[in-house]
Swiss-Prot record:
Keyword terms: Isomerase, Purine biosynthesis
Family assignment from sequence similarity: Belongs to the AIR carboxylase family. Class I subfamily.
Catalytic reaction annotation: 5-carboxyamino-1-(5-phospho-D-ribosyl)imidazole + H(+) = 5-amino-1-(5-phospho-D-ribosyl)imidazole-4-carboxylate
Highest taxon listed in the record's lineage: Archaea
UniProt-recorded name of the protein: Probable N5-carboxyaminoimidazole ribonucleotide mutase
Pathway connected to this protein: Purine metabolism; IMP biosynthesis via de novo pathway; 5-amino-1-(5-phospho-D-ribosyl)imidazole-4-carboxylate from 5-amino-1-(5-phospho-D-ribosyl)imidazole (N5-CAIR route): step 2/2
HAMAP family, per database record: PurE_classI (MF_01929)
Amino acid sequence: MKPRVMILLGSASDFRIAEKAMEIFEELRIPYDLRVASAHRTHEKVKAIVSEAVKAGVEVFIGIAGLSAHLPGMISANTHRPVIGVPVDVKLGGLDALFACSQMPFPAPVATVGVDRGENAAILAAQIIGIGDPGVRERVADLRRGFYERVRRDECQVLNSIEGSYYAPLEVEMPPIGDKVPSDSQDDPMVSVIPGSYSDMKIAKKTTMFLERMGISYDLNVISPIRYPERFERYLEKMENVKLFIAISGLSAHVTGAVVALSDRPVIGVPCPLKMNGWDSLLSMINMPPGVPVGTVGVGNGGNAAILAAEMLGIYDEKIESRIKRIKSRSVKF
């Protein structure tokens, strides 16, 4: 049995975060390996681990680190496989590590998840593997239904504890949870790119430009889940066979949250600097609750979103893999 995921820790103290990821991989039956290597103190060891892991067939890397958290970025600089970054709360509430993971230069993206969210890193890794492995995708769908059931149980506990005289609960009929895993079609685009508004189009066009140059088919639709919720859901149903989503949004960044709530495909988030220099959308995208990860890139970095999409798709597509290798080796310059 060979590992499909490599987990690298910046220090042994990060193991408590890795345990969350390992529990998910055990449940999903995805083989993994784990090593401890510092980007600053054992630079050559990191490079050696990444190189050997790629040769051994590892499909996804997870870098877990706190403080300056350069480990995920260093992994990305040395591989064409997708890298997920988990910032760890050591100081400053983990914000230092969060910025270090997400704000990577082109073309070295890190799909950053929330602070200490090892479980979301594992789920995102499984979603990426599920692009070309229907069995893994089905198990991820089952896992997500388990999170739904957990919320239902928590609600029952809360409601059963209410003793107020004026508590008047309504009867709410809940819709069934979808369990259909759609079949792929050759006619469907690989990627759906969803800007939340026309003000996000400049970044969206940069994203699609790189997708086109890497030969990745896509659909582009400007639609807001806040202004047009029903239309948004209909569009997601139409795009059920895409392999991944890229959501581009500023402000509270509801687009990414809405997409990941309605699809089990990987979601890449691109925060836009409409207000607060993009801090609001960056934090809203990254810090998702357990079970619904968004792999977030740097503020306004549509190019890195496209590169990350290519890294994910390249696991199962040799042509895309070849193109992303050339880009990351700097033999091709856009």
